[in-house]
Amino acid sequence: AMAANSNLKRVADQGFGQSLLDSTIRIGDGKVGDIQQKFAMLHLDPARPRNSRTHGLDEMAPTLPEIFEAWKDKLNHGDRGPAILLDLSPRLDNSQRIEVEEIVETFWPNIGKTWVWTSRGKGRVDRLSLWIGQLSSPNVQRRFVRIPPDIKEKPLVIEGDIEEISEHR
């Protein structure tokens, strides 16, 4: 959260103007507390054990349902619902991603969702995130972003929908 705050400050300093500088950035453990303010976006990076082999959803603290319950009435809604960005373990398998989607659906039925895998190469996925509601891309369920070694080059972005090609696997 501290890094996100610092990154937003850097973005604001590069010309995004006073509106970003006037924004409230709340850093904490995911529990809202007694506040009356509504928020435009929730960026959640739940704590996970560093040396875990399973990267199960039950290892996140606090859990996604706890956080969504705390925040659901504190988020502004646009025409596609609230703006939520979940940073998750890149090791989540398909069944765990489906479980995350089911949890999201219990709080915001039929909301748009875009899964984003990000890699810097060397055969590994560095980040996995779920962009929800206002942050999701309509008609794009999955996106892969390959960041090149030279930051002056544009990243490779591949987008598409889910299409099962086999029941096996």
Where are these regions (language model features)?
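Class I S-adenosyl-L-methionine
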Residues: 34, 38-39, 43, 48-169
